[in-house]
Amino acid sequence: MAAVAAASAELLIIGWYIFRVLLQVFLECCIYWVGFAFRNPPGTQPIARSEVFRYSLQKLAYTVSRTGRHVLGERRQRAPN
């Protein structure tokens, strides 16, 4: 029962990171449509799409590897910044 709960929690975390990636991509792709409500404040630079992907994929890879280590019973490590 505990294994099922742990697996469900890890899937929820992985789903959250996938949602964040999709949200960032949506905002980066669609933010400059004419009439779109969300825009960057004047004088600021948008985050590069490659930077968003790299950060999100690093976090996702860390979460997946942490899940594997948890299942195998290995020690924890800190998340990448």
Swiss-Prot record:
Any one cellular-component term (Gene Ontology): cytoplasm
Gene Ontology biological-process entries: brain development; positive regulation of insulin secretion
Keywords: Developmental protein
InterPro entries: Neuronatin (IPR024885)
Biological role stated in the UniProt entry: May participate in the maintenance of segment identity in the hindbrain and pituitary development, and maturation or maintenance of the overall structure of the nervous system. May function as a regulatory subunit of ion channels.
UniProt family annotation: Belongs to the neuronatin family.
Protein name as annotated: Neuronatin
Organism this protein belongs to: Bos taurus (Bovine)
Gene transcribed to yield this protein: NNAT
